[in-house]
Regions:
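Acidic, glycine/polar-enriched metal-coordinating patches/loops
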Residues: 215-218, 239
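Short beta-strand/loop segment at the start of cytosolic alpha/beta domains
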Residues: 42-74
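Sec-dependent N-terminal signal peptides of Gram-positive bacterial secreted proteins and lipoproteins
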Residues: 3-26
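Consensus positions within tandem repeat domains that build extended binding/scaffold surfaces
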Residues: 96-99, 118-123, 141-146, 164-169, ...
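Sec-dependent signal peptide cleavage junction
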Residues: 18-43
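Asparagine/serine/threonine-enriched low-complexity, disordered tracts
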Residues: 2, 29, 35-38, 120, ...
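Structural signature of tandem-repeat unit edges
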Residues: 58-59, 64-67, 76-93, 103-116, ...
Length: 249
C-alpha cells in the first residue's frame, strides 16, 4: 500500500512540474524560423540577418518567392561594393537587415529592382562615403544608415513610400532634398537626429507630417527651405528652425 501511495505522489509531482514548465513561457526561447530577425530597433542594436538559401559569388541570398530574392550575407572583403541585380535567375529586390553593419565598406551600388533596404543594413559603416539609391526604391528601414559618419551626400529617389525612424541619424550629411513624391508624406522620429553637419533641408509640398525630433541635434545653422503656405513653413516656424520660403510656381 505504501508503494502504491508513493507512486501516486510521484506522478502528481511530475504533472505539476510539467504544467509549470508549459506555462512559464519557456517555449518562447526556442529558435524561430530562419527568416525571422531581431525586433530590437534602437540605434546600434544588432539585428541578426536572415540565413541564406543559397550563395552566389560573395553573397548569400534568401528566396522570397519564385522570382525574387533578398541578399542577406556578404562574405567578401571589398571596400567598393556592387550588389548584383540577379542571383540564380531571380531578381534581387531586398537588401537584408544587418547586411553590412559595422563593416569598412566605402561605397555601394544598389541595383535597379531593389525596392527595400531593411533595418541596420549599413549602420555604423564608418567609412561609407557613397551610396546610390535606385529608382524604384520604396522603403528605407529603421537605422539603415545610422552612424555612417562619412556619408555626406544623399540623393533619394521620388519612388520612396516610407523612410523609417533613425534611418539617416548621426550621418555626415550636409544637405538633403526630400523628393517630391505622391507616396511619401511623412518624416518620422529622428530620421536625421544628431546629423551635426546638416545645415540645409529642402521640403516638397508632398510632405505633410514631420515628427518633432526629426531634426533634433542637427547643425545650429540648420535652414529649412519650403514652399510658401506649405506644411514645411509652419513646421520650421513652430520648431524655431531658420526658414527660407520658396515661391510656388
Amino acid at each position: 500500500m505504501k508503494k502504491i501511495l508513493s507512486a501516486i505522489i510521484a506522478l502528481a509531482l511530475c504533472a505539476s512540474v510539467a504544467v509549470g514548465a508549459s506555462g512559464c513561457g519557456c517555449e518562447k526561447n526556442k529558435k524561430t524560423a530562419k527568416n525571422t530577425t531581431s525586433t530590437s530597433s534602437g540605434p546600434g542594436y544588432k539585428v541578426e540577418p536572415t540565413n541564406p538559401d543559397f550563395e552566389e559569388g560573395q553573397f548569400g541570398f534568401y528566396r522570397l518567392n519564385d522570382n525574387e530574392v533578398k541578399v542577406t550575407v556578404y562574405n567578401g572583403n571589398e571596400k567598393n561594393i556592387e550588389i548584383p541585380a540577379t542571383a540564380n535567375g531571380s531578381k534581387v529586390t531586398v537588401v537584408g537587415a544587418n547586411l553590412f553593419q559595422a563593416s569598412d565598406i566605402e561605397s555601394v551600388k544598389i541595383p535597379e529592382g531593389v525596392t527595400e533596404i531593411q533595418k541596420h543594413a549599413f549602420s555604423s559603416c564608418q567609412n561609407l562615403k557613397e551610396v546610390n539609391f535606385p529608382d524604384g526604391l520604396k522603403v528605407i528601414g529603421e537605422n539603415a544608415f545610422w552612424n555612417c559618419k562619412k556619408l555626406e551626400k544623399i540623393e533619394l529617389p521620388s519612388t520612396l513610400k516610407k523612410i523609417e525612424w533613425y534611418a539617416f541619424s548621426a550621418t555626415g550629411v550636409k544637405s538633403i532634398s526630400i523628393p517630391l513624391s505622391d507616396t511619401l508624406s511623412t518624416l518620422p522620429e529622428k530620421v536625421f537626429f544628431q546629423c551635426s553637419n546638416l545645415s540645409e533641408v529642402t521640403l516638397p509640398l508632398s510632405i505633410t507630417n514631420i515628427a518633432d525630433d526629426t531634426f533634433a541635434e542637427c547643425a545650429d545653422n540648420l535652414t529649412i527651405k519650403a514652399y510658401t503656405g506649405s506644411y514645411g513653413v509652419s513646421y520650421a516656424k513652430n520648431h524655431n528652425i531658420k526658414l527660407e520660403e520658396m515661391p510656388r510656381s
